[in-house]
């Protein structure tokens, strides 16, 4: 602890120099209140579909036993080894070796494998979409530090923990409170991919001896793939059984929704960026999958991100107009730059919206800022979309509201 504390001053000086322009320039962080994939920095894919069937990594001194059973998630694997060791492989990023309490790190471990020593506790949570998963399997008491103030949480247990003092604000992802984390013996920082905008900050956290885990759940193409990350976090805390039980319940909810007959009505899901561009989801993202399950068709049928594997794509207004002007429904993603509550507010962002079919027909909806944190209840948004597509009872909706 003394060694870690002594390094804080030097690290904070480095941070000050970087912020003052004396270091390398980081990419823009976007809206710090959300860890949306819309502004994620990404790596090019280097793995193909065969990765899902690859053999478990061989680790000197460890004996492989089994692999976690996954149904929808494709962005990670968890391998189990004898004596309680586990290896988490996040395909877009790194591998993380979970070392059980009382055991030691294997000798000659590859330098690029991040070691997480159990018990996993005093966690810093900046990946806001993951907090609801911790709450769902009973692991929220292991989260001691938050990347949001109490007012920023829509997960009730997290908000209550902040207000009671059980959980403490320790700086947002880009401006960490290093001293608070060190004094509180932070054992793990769980970050969204927004941390990739500030690589120097991640390095400084790691230099303090705090392992950093980056959550890529937003890269999943199926809505339940994102929820299935609860199994990964269950493995971190040795709560696999509780995580499996919750996931099976959510999977059952989604399976029941698959009987919806498709209406063939088209839906565009988007938000307007601060630079005036339109940000939409690529076609194989989990949001278009939800629209399909709900009984609709995503307006952008074959949209890909040409530059990276990020789930969102920036379009010019002209590009968006060409496809979405005739869409039956527009859904404005209010989790990013705040809710747009009325048609007039939408048209103020760009007057061309007045020409859209959905605007003329009064079929424009928006999501609340709480949606991104609700990773544990994806079925509710699908139900909302189905009610929207079938002119159902709006009072039964959880996340969608109609623009007036």
Predicted regions and their residues:
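Structured C-terminal subdomain patch of bacterial secreted/periplasmic proteins
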Residues: 51, 220-248, 326-404
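Structural recognition of the beta-strand scaffold that forms the well-ordered cores
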Residues: 122-125, 142-147, 188-192, 212-215, ...
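Bacterial Sec-exported substrate-binding components of ABC uptake systems
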Residues: 2, 23-131, 242-269, 393-404
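Flexible, glycine-rich surface segments
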Residues: 259-341
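Bacterial N-terminal signal peptides that target proteins for export
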Residues: 1-9
